[in-house]
Amino acid sequence: MKDQGSSGVSPAPGEGEKKAINSELWHACAGPLVSLPPVGSLVVYFPQGHSEQVAASMHKELDNIPGYPSLPSKLICKLLSLTLHADSETDEVYAQMTLQPVNKYDRDAMLASELGLKQNKQPAEFFCKTLTASDTSTHGGFSVPRRAAEKIFPPLDFTMQPPAQELIAKDLHDISWKFRHIYRGQPKRHLLTTGWSVFVSTKRLLAGDSVLFIRDEKSQLLLGIRRATRPQPALSSSVLSSDSMHIGILAAAAHAAANSSPFTIFYNPRASPSEFVIPLAKYNKALYTQVSLGMRFRMLFETEDSGVRRYMGTITGIGDLDPVRWKNSHWRNLQVGWDESTASERRTRVSIWEIEPVATPFYICPPPFFRPKLPKQPGMPDDENEVESAFKRAMPWLADDFALKDVQSALFPGLSLVQWMAMQQNPQMLTAASQTVQSPYLNSNALAMQDVMGSSNEDPTKRLNTQAQNMVLPNLQVGSKVDHPVMSQHQQQPHQLSQQQQVQPSQQSSVVLQQHQAQLLQQNAIHLQQQQEHLQRQQSQPAQQLKAASSLHSVEQHKLKEQTSGGQVASQAQMLNQIFPPSSSQLQQLGLPKSPTHRQGLTGLPIAGSLQQPTLTQTSQVQQAAEYQQALLQSQQQQQQLQLQQLSQPEVQLQLLQKIQQQNMLSQLNPQHQSQLIQQLSQKSQEILQQQILQHQFGGSDSIGQLKQSPSQQAPLNHMTGSLTPQQLVRSHSALAESGDPSSSTAPSTSRISPINSLSRANQGSRNLTDMVATPQIDNLLQEIQSKPDNRIKNDIQSKETVPIHNRHPVSDQLDASSATSFCLDESPREGFSFPPVCLDNNVQVDPRDNFLIAENVDALMPDALLSRGMASGKGMCTLTSGQRDHRDVENELSSAAFSSQSFGVPDMSFKPGCSSDVAVTDAGMPSQGLWNNQTQRMRTFTKVQKRGSVGRSIDITRYRDYDELRHDLACMFGIQGQLEDPYRMDWKLVYVDHENDILLVGDDPWEEFVGCVKSIKILSAAEVQQMSLDGDLGGVPPQTQACSASDDANAWRG
């Protein structure tokens, strides 16, 4: 028969003389998840749960439990009394509760129920060990873990040999047991020897049972046991009928509910599958939780060492456990599935108050703590959710901050993230949206999106050609057939300009019109080629002038390629082609025939954004300059063809495609602004071009200021440069700047591959150029042009040294190449030139997941230009530094370091997750660092120490030699001398947060390992430790750490 010993909570009548069972020891034996409600509080009693306890005690299936028709599924009761018991033979703990059903309740009872949730009756310091066969043998004694012995037992006197002492511990029945605690053996360990075998035999302990030692609030050593669950023989029906027990308890509850009279129940926490007497506050709180199918949740389970662990699961069903006998009951009405395969033995049905629902918000940009710790290789799957991955695969040119940071973007105004996700599923919505947006780029890119969605398995070069056509053709003009003479073409341009302004909106959305443009392209190429052949026959000029004109040829050759790919200004392109005809290999790589008829096809079309028309005199001067340069063509063209033929077809396509967006920006200028800009820049631009040419003659000095020469030295060049339009001069200067300094980059030349929002960057560049037109100052305009060069192809000096051009692989094979930023042409025609490092390059990049090639428009500005123009540096910096991997992986890899400016060609900056736009700026509004100076991230070298109610301190952890010095110093800092050094005091606990954001007890690790992994230290009170154990609070650690390391944060060593 069970012992009827009472507790100090509510002693039974007539038993006040008996020694009360220690509440902490009772709860320690009951388990870490057991918490009885306080007396006087309101509870909810579930008869189904009570029947399950009886069935578990009688080893009977739940299906055979009888029901009781007149008993409701739950009863709201008031807890009148609570008595703690322990069996005198087995030490099994159980509780006796007296409940009284209530129809209404007062405020005090409800308040008592709420306060009961915050009370933690588990002991602060204890350890539990499952006995092994050697522990239960008659010799050898009980082996105690070292850390447990140091925390729970009094300290040994190590001056003795061997160190030993006598321990006295009391059990649940207040019986004292004496043990000899000795430290011996090889290796040495803590043992309980004398008295242990007597305890084992008296309690009839077996291997698998557990023994626990605790220190109560009075620092008394207490001893308890937990018996392992073992199958027991079923009782004979003649001795006791389980059905009669079920009917008896259900009848008593039904009678009490009908008459509002008290009734008594017994609760066995070790035998009952779940608590069936729940605090009303806990029940009401659970009912407010909106559960649904598929919801994720956590649930606490007890571990072998008396700790707790959270298991993750998913709600798979909602319904009655027994719809026939207990209809509309909340008892185990949730059907769940568990994540871990080891959790297969967990029950499949739980109650709503037993789980902790997990809110899973939608992250379009995953937080830092969801990211992998190790960098990923290109093409490897990412940890992003599936929705985000699909979003990026469909629109790889959009940056991560699209529709989040720049919600007022002029490209896609009024489109929320939800609408974009809907467009991903329905491409027709994307086409409809593109018709309402006034942007020269949207229609072409909308078509490109549909192409990607519809043909994700196409060859990358085919998709490149498709996108190139969609981006170029909307900017071409449909007009009448171009006449053969050059001047007749010039005379038609004013009329074509007005015609273009009327037709352009329809051109951007008409595919048929694009086909007509392609035909017109070929027709114009035939007429322009005739003019080219006429100019090539006039090749007779002095050879001594070849050196001075060689640099101009190099400049205009690059200029020609830009105009060929973009089709920007027809008249300028014609004059340049007359002077410097492009090699046939250039357009051959674009997929055009080698025939001379196609060598000028792209430049012959009249364009809406043409700036100024040359006069007859200018045309004749251009022809004279062309005759002057024909001799140079013979010597240079063969070399240029050889260089370009060494490039593979995809590489040339990439180089030309990246110029398209740059040319489109200028086409947005109206004629009035164009004329104003040209008149202001005319004189200054000619001087700049002459200075650049003289620079080449005098050895390529690095200082532009040294190029200023006397008027007599500039005079011989006036006849050659005066014939050129100011647009050409400005573009020529920009073309000189594009070649850059071969020494400005030390990285080998490969392709940089990354999904970047090129569309928004292009529009920013367009707005910047419009602002530049409105500025009346010539010097300011020139500074704007110099601070914003055209997007170019960088020249890397090591491209010839490390990666031979003729051995390059196709673009799709360069995904694993080094981290250089662009392709490279041969620098031999431009050796000796040195230009400012502000001339950064543009990159042709690709999404590494589907190899979809895209052209990125990078505004390569200095930091001050970025700030003064109000550009979003959060996007711009991402663009400039994006690599062949996803730029968010780069952020992870470089979050604690700075970029190397010599390798990337951009100012150093420290990156934060999300491509932070924080830029160090001085009071004057300028960047605090030079353009190429390294900027290291601020690193904390001292360790933070925090204690609630006190100001935090910072210490140098490396100056301490051991834990004792650390504890003593911290105790002095916070005015708790003597309370941290004594390991047996329970007032304060010293814990630390390691580099994995786990909270551990200071002193468990070796000192050297502790110094290397500690991030911060916290001094917790006993109440804080208990609250952490109850709530599972890890002090601000991210949620996933709670789920992953719950076995560590709530084990037997909590305190």
From Swiss-Prot:
It is found in: Nucleus. GO terms for cellular component: nucleus. Signal peptide: none annotated. Keywords: Auxin signaling pathway, DNA-binding, Nucleus, Transcription, Transcription regulation. Residues 488-510, 532-552, 742-756 have a biased composition (Low complexity). It comes from the Eukaryota. Residues 485-510, 532-565, 585-609, 701-720, 732-769, 1034-1055 are annotated as: Disordered. Residues 940-1024 form the PB1 domain. GO terms for molecular function: DNA binding. Belongs to the ARF family. This is Auxin response factor 16.
